[in-house]
């Protein structure tokens, strides 16, 4: 798709392993806050995995349904109390069935990416919310033999920077907002020491600037007919 796997990552079988979905109660708070800020009340969670994010949102009074192609994942999500549906190339919902559709850390794993996006925008009334790993600085990081931890999944088939993600979503939406998030602070070597906390305060105050962001957050509005 956008950036080739070969040009971005070293593919070693003993390092890169398939990623697993978050378990209930182990969701990443920034993703939940992102959805809370932008989503409507009714939400379809595509690629829901074990349902960690839908369950967290349901606890915040959102009406969520989880969809996935993996029946084992859906079984665990349903056992946790999440309404679920097995999905295929065509989603089993009428046009505009949900206020929002979310795909959190999903589309980088999907070979037929445009097909699932077409369906996501079809069943959404308001918007489609997407998060993906940010690939814009991977080559620079690779030169120093490092990468973001969540890039170590062997089942990533697409890699996005802000421009390529906006171009892709622009095929389905006239209003796309892309934000970089989850900054990487270059002081891992002093982790949890007094220096670590002091440097972190300086970054939060804006006195020091970070140049690396590990995730992209996208809000794409549904086109009006």
In which residue ranges do the predicted regions lie?
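Conserved N-terminal segment of class I S-adenosyl-L-methionine
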Residues: 1-94, 100, 104, 117, ...
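A structural helix-start
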Residues: 24, 71, 110-111, 136
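Residues lining the SAM
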Residues: 104-107, 131
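Residue-level signal for the nucleotide or nucleotide-sugar donor/cofactor binding architecture
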Residues: 108-111, 160
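Short N-terminal helix/helix-N-cap motif within the alpha/beta-hydrolase-1
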Residues: 111-115, 140
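A short glycine-rich, Lys/Arg-flanked "PGG" loop and its adjoining helix->strand segment in the class I
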Residues: 114-129
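Conserved class I S-adenosyl-L-methionine
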Residues: 129-156
